[in-house]
From Swiss-Prot:
Protein name: Wings apart-like protein homolog 1
Family affiliation: Belongs to the WAPL family.
Organism (species): Schizosaccharomyces pombe (strain 972 / ATCC 24843) (Fission yeast)
Any one GO BP annotation for this protein: cell division
Biased composition (Polar residues): 54-66
Predominant subcellular localization, coarse grouping: nucleus
Highest classification ranks of the organism: Eukaryota, Fungi, Dikarya, Ascomycota, Taphrinomycotina
Repeat keyword on record: no
Amino acid sequence: MKRGKCKEKDNGLKRISSESEVWNFLDVTVSELNKQKRSPGQTVSKRLHKKQRVVSNPDLSLPSSPVKQILRNGLQNSKYGSHKTGLERSASCSSIDASANHSSTTYREQRSYLMEEGLDTQPIVPREVSSGRELDSTNHTIGTERAFLIEEDVSEDDEIQMKSIHELRFAGEQQRIVDEIEYLVDGVTFSGNSSASRYLSLIGIAEKMFDNSFRLCLKSIRDVFLRIFEEIDPKDTLHTFLQIYIFATMANEMDCMSSLLDAYSNNVKLLLQTAITLEPQVPVSILAKSLPKSVKGAVQEFVIKAELTFSFSNESLASSDSISLAAIALMKTSSGVFAESELFTELINLLIEKSYPILKENDGSNNFLLHALCSSLEKFTDFQGSEKIQKVSQILSSKLQILIDEHNETNSPKIDDTVVHACSEKLLRTLIQTVNSNSDHALAVSKSEVPLFAYKILQKFSNFSSDDETTRELIILILGLLLGLVEESHEFIQTITHVEVSFGASALDVLISFYQKNESIVEISGYVVMILSHCFLNDPKAFAQLKPLISQFYESLHKFKNFHLKLKEELMMMGSNGLAIVSIIDELHKSLQDYLRSDLVK
């Protein structure tokens, strides 16, 4: 009997100990929750448990596995205790109430704080009945509050976290590119490196110049960019070529160009002068012929994939020589801050002089040089002397000759849209601008072969279709240049009746024939009439030949004026000031009108 009682007493003590551990666990849990709730700046689990959600199993909401085991043991002991006698249960309850009196008070205070209800007024339910329900209710309250805190923070924290991730990734990627740039530039500038290492470093930079991230980082560390041009070696042609390529790709970056000119304008001048004046000019692929195999392979791969020329040509850079690359570089800078410098003017005039012997040939080669030079000259008027105008005129004459030869071979009434055609248009625009701005330049153009080839183009393509935009645009530019010459030079007017374009046909004959075939095309016939009207009013020999056509000229000028008035209204609606040509048409129209009136009087 005594042993049985001792055993029962031992079981009761164990149960009391286990249940005490259960309630102590709850005290600790609720205290921890209150600490978290009293710290509004803290979030549940600090983003590390954002995906956590409340589950129905109370064990999963407990923070540590040892405590969970204690709770399980306590609950199991409670179950065993429910089968004991009433005396034993009474003794157990008395022992628990006595031993847990202090902790239960704290627990009530904690619960009343969490649930915001007057739980102090509720009667204490016996443990056997209340333990399961109260434990479930408490865990549910804890889980609900935890879920509320998580849901409240998850959207804001997700956004902040994603932003932080992107910023960190971008910063890391940016730093990686900056490190790469500095490494490559160090490879170029470090005196201890071999020439092969410097070439490979320059190629590494040049290959990535069309990578937006690379360019942005290179712009952001401008002092590193400038180091590429610290040293120029005129004798090292490949090194010079690669430096010019990098210069050309950054030509439209105004800030970089300004800094480069401020720091190393003499180096830039030496760099481009070296490329323009190099003799003999050879393709870049040949420059690496005698270099180590690694450099040779890298150069060949680079010039095939280089993107610099793809914006205006389908050809790779492999066939380009140094002067062509220098011309491309000047073309790229022709609309930026570099074009406003005296250095640009000096280099363009040097380029005209050195490219003239190459481009006057009609072999169809050096398209890069032709396109780049013509594009650079399209808005260029600061020619240093009439000699440069004569050379530009000679280049244009050679290209117009190519168009005529192609027509003779195919007998086609239209001009194909080729590099030669496009460059001829650019050169015509250049000469129109310079003729209208400088009478000396007008005289230089009038004495060149350009007018003769212009008449030949009008003769060969007099039957062109009005729908042929390519031929139409070229003809309008030719007529515009001839009109500028007759307005600026009376000597040129005298030549129109004398110069022989083909056997038995003078320039005046060609112009009259062209007018009669294209009278219905107002904007074409109008320019021809303006040229012929100047001849009629200023050359007695032309007067006799043109007199029968004056009435037609008068009507054509009237239509031409109305055409431009309508165009003027459209331009003024878009904010333009109108067209100066209208006043010129008015003067000629009035002069013809005066002649017709005087002729009627006679």
